[in-house]
Design a protein with these regions (language model features):
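Conserved "HGTGT" condensation-loop signature of ketosynthase/thiolase-family condensing enzymes
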Residues: 1-154
């Protein structure tokens, strides 16, 4: 667990809580950021939250986030923000993504952050992919890492 202790609903503008959450998940897993296949973003669809999270993703994953080799998406466009239940529902979606080898869609995105133009951000159609290692970013202070050792599609 990690947190920036900035505000109950607003992240610190430099993304320190999200950076700490994802960095801790990577450290605990023993993985390098380039070894992560999928990231489930918190993506609250708030201007501040999305900007801070995008900054944190770029900081932690650098070129890996924009090259197309890291798939990332969010389920909130499909289900809304379920407040206290959001993390559990995102975890379920992510486990299903791993099980089926399909990154979840990011629905209702009209203008993705231009920094991620070349990233694999499934907006309209799902794409089968081998998901071996994921980071599930559940918000300001929660993170989960899952590493699957299979060499084949799940």
């Amino acid at each position: 667990m990690s947190g920036d202790a900035h505000h109950i609903t607003q992240p610190h503008t430099d993304g320190r809580g999200a950076i700490l959450a994802m960095t801790c998940a990577l450290k605990q897993s023993g993985l390098h950021p380039n070894q992560v296949d999928y990231l489930n973003a918190h993506a609250t669809s708030t201007p501040l939250g999305d900007k801070v999270e995008a900054t944190a993703i770029r900081t932690v994953f650098s070129d890996h986030a924009t090259s197309g080799s890291l798939a990332f998406s969010s389920t909130k466009g499909a289900i809304g923000h379920l407040l206290g239940a959001a993390g559990a529902v995102e975890a379920i979606f992510t486990v299903l993504a791993i099980h089926h080898g399909v990154a979840t869609l990011t629905l209702n995105v009209k203008e993705p952050d231009p920094t991620f133009d070349d990233a694999f951000l499934p907006l309209t159609a799902s794409k089968r992919c081998r998901i071996r290692s994921i980071i599930l970013f559940l918000g300001l202070d929660d993170n989960l890492h899952y590493n699957h050792s299979s060499k084949t599609a799940i």
